Amino acid sequence: MSPNPLPSSEVTSSDRDLIVLARWMAGDFSNAKQAFDNPKDYAHIHVYFRPLPFEFFSGIGLYSEQVYDYDLWRPYRQGVHRLVDWGDRIYIENYGLKDAIFYAGAARELSILKTITPDCIERREGCSMIFKRDGDRFRGCVEPGNRCLIEKKGCQTYLDSSVEITETTWVSLDRGMDVKTHQQVWGSTFGPLRFEKKESFDREVPTLATDGNH
């Protein structure tokens, strides 16, 4: 996949933060150490973020998969993400995939990734994430309003999600909260998942003509 550069005249400091975040996200993350140290509490999971071509959103986008290490071809979560410059923050629109199983493995096989088109996705309303840079890391959380609704265990819940990312790590905590009682229904009760980057796909992120990397 050959990324297209953004014109230098359009590059701002907030654009650079957006590109840095995209590059840090682009990779194969594994919580192998956490799962090995605490096998009763944590399964071994991979989180993949693979850059999409610039033309997909006329901007920066990523495809993601979350899979158990023992079953890499059957992701339990897939998505497409569009990064949007909000000045001092970065807004990530989240999209679901229609017939998602057809694209399983796209994070590892570029031939599958190329079959994903804008017609394949639909916006997950209320489920966007908002990130802000904090020195050597970005911190993000789901947009306010408790509108990212997910039905599980016969209960209507909203997503409570927080993420911290550095160049080499991804720490996330996703919990489903009852819309009426605000009590946790699903998600980790042992604390956040802690991932380390095993492989980077940062070279596939569209480049900036005057990019200073960090």
What name fits each language-model region?
Residues 1-5:
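N-terminal acidic, proline/glycine-rich, low-complexity intrinsically disordered segments
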Residues 47-69, 73-74:
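N-terminal glycine/threonine-rich, aromatic-flanked beta-hairpin/loop signature
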